[in-house]
Amino acid sequence: DVYKRQYLVYPVVGIFLTGLFVRYVVKDDISHGVTKILYAISRRQGRIKRHNTWSSIIASSITIGFGGSVGAEAPIVLTGSAIGSNLGTIFKMEHRTLMLLVGCGAAGAVAGIFKAPIAGLVFTLEVLMIDLTMSSLLPLLISAVTAATVSVSYTHLRAHETGAYL
């Protein structure tokens, strides 16, 4: 009986910790990752808040780690896009380049988490509506292939093969 109840306790603890993290550390709404990206593209010239580079991935990791039900796609896409957006903002890139960096972050995120570079490319072209030109396709493809390659290379590492340094 006690062991059966633990299956309910862990997700509740995870949601409680996530709620505390969002309320007292982030102090902003971090829900609906893809919607936030689309809003940033349409209303904020592609600028995504800095805390989105880390907040959604930490909150979803806590929830998933404790057995809660949350998808991994939206937080990782928001994180990748936020990294691209903030790098473009730091280096004062023009609007078109900033949008491309947001797309590269999203393509890399989807490709890395699903190990599918073409899916990352198609997701970015379809959902974020990046223009279908060679000057935008090439960086998106490079981002997606690089992310998928890095993801595959890291998931094949085993502790016994690396001397247990992982």
Question: What residue spans do the PLM features occupy?
Answer:
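Alpha-helical transmembrane segments and immediately membrane-proximal extracytoplasmic
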Residues: D1-A164
